[in-house]
Design a protein with these regions (language model features):
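Carbohydrate-associated surface elements
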Residues: 98
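GIY-YIG nuclease catalytic motif and its immediate N-terminal context
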Residues: 1-54, 77-91, 95, 103, ...
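A broadly used, surface-exposed interaction patch
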Residues: 50-74
Length: 110
């Protein structure tokens, strides 16, 4: 399944971190509530799989009503370009008043 965020086609939603590829890209954690997607967090990582393996997604799910989705956009763009994509998506959601909490996921110890 694909989810379009801005001009980018994100893959997902993913339930388990081992479903992700060990590649660089942009991630978005979405909260589906009241029949719309709200953005919880958007960012970039050199290894989406490694990052996702450390995020305590279950902890977030228990704190929020509705459904939480992890989506990714794989790209080998340089880090600064990936940051720009994440920033643009965050701003788009803010302008549409569709930002939900903008939380920072808790990471497990490496």
């Amino acid at each position: 399944m694909s989810i379009y965020l801005g001009l980018f086609e994100f893959e997902g939603p993913f339930v388990e971190h081992d479903e992700l590829k060990d590649e660089s890209g942009v991630y978005a954690i979405l909260h589906f509530v009241d029949n719309e997607y709200k953005l919880l967090r958007c960012g970039e990582r050199d290894s989406l799989q490694k990052w996702a393996s450390r995020v305590k997604l279950d902890e977030i799910k228990h704190r929020l009503p509705g459904k939480m989705l992890l989506t990714v956009y794989y790209t080998n763009f340089p880090k600064e370009a990936r940051k720009s994509i994440a920033k643009a998506i965050t701003e788009e959601f803010r302008q549409q008043a569709r930002v939900s909490y903008l939380i920072k996921p808790t990471l497990q110890a490496a």
